[in-house]
Amino acid sequence: MELGAKTVFSMKLGSYNFAITETVVLQWIIMAVIILLAIFLTKNLKKVPNRKQSVIEMIVNLINGLVKENMGEKFMNFVPIIGTMAVFILFLNLTGLVGIEPATKDISVTAGFALVSAFLINATAIKRIGVGGYIKSIFSQGPIMVPMNLLEKVTIPVSLCLRLFINMLVGAIVMSLIYSTPAKILLPVPLHGFFDMFDGVLQVYVFVLLTMIFTKLGIEH
């Protein structure tokens, strides 16, 4: 298993040369799959739900409940962004089920998600309490705590990035080691069940949960 993502092709824009890696291509494919799946599942919706519509309603209700429970009624407008993030990361985590290494073992991918979360956290705080209130929250505990409060703005996205990256990387490394031993005949199926299904779903839950908690705390400070 290689830790670095391979370059598939390059794109030149002016004097800049952009390397398009395997993980970037995989994300494009996953986005296309999600869009097509969403179109299929939401086509011809009816008042009396059929099996297909029931699946969609179950997913929507699950995300609604997650946001409501952890952020409250006034944050229900966050359902689309939280839901989109959760579904996208979940699909990326579960690619191991079809023999493709998860894109989330690439730190550039998890860093991208962490930056989106950081933007959401800070932009929401500024929108709700204003620029003045946001700056005041940094200085509210006295000058001695200003460096710590500023450091917190950096450590939150860093921790979100590393938590998801390390957990998915460890799973990929373990599976790679197993496949290089004679035990590969018996062990891959149950191990894939853990690392790709259980751990993959768990990491999605932890990531979006922390994003919601930090977003709410950013307003309450």
Swiss-Prot record:
Disulfide bonds: none annotated. Pfam families: ATP-synt_A. The keyword Transmembrane helix applies. InterPro entries: ATP_syn_F0_a_bact/chloroplast (IPR045082), ATP_synth_F0_asu (IPR000568), F0_ATP_A_sf (IPR035908). It is a multi-pass membrane protein. CDD domains: ATP-synt_Fo_a_6. It is found in: Cell membrane. It comes from the Bacteria. One of its GO terms (cellular component) is plasma membrane. One of its GO terms (molecular function) is proton-transporting ATP synthase activity, rotational mechanism. GO terms for biological process: proton motive force-driven plasma membrane ATP synthesis. Keywords: ATP synthesis, Cell membrane, CF(0), Hydrogen ion transport, Ion transport, Membrane, Transmembrane, Transmembrane helix, Transport. Its main location: membrane. The chain crosses the membrane at residues 20-40, 78-98, 106-126, 158-178, 194-214. F-type ATPases have 2 components, CF(1) - the catalytic core - and CF(0) - the membrane proton channel. CF(1) has five subunits: alpha(3), beta(3), gamma(1), delta(1), epsilon(1). CF(0) has three main subunits: a(1), b(2) and c(9-12). The alpha and beta chains form an alternating ring which encloses part of the gamma chain. CF(1) is attached to CF(0) by a central stalk formed by the gamma and epsilon chains, while a peripheral stalk is formed by the delta and b chains. Belongs to the ATPase A chain family. Key component of the proton channel; it plays a direct role in the translocation of protons across the membrane. NCBIfam families: PRK05815.3-2. This is ATP synthase subunit a. It comes from Clostridium acetobutylicum (strain ATCC 824 / DSM 792 / JCM 1419 / IAM 19013 / LMG 5710 / NBRC 13948 / NRRL B-527 / VKM B-1787 / 2291 / W). The lineage of its organism: Bacteria, Bacillati, Bacillota, Clostridia, Eubacteriales.
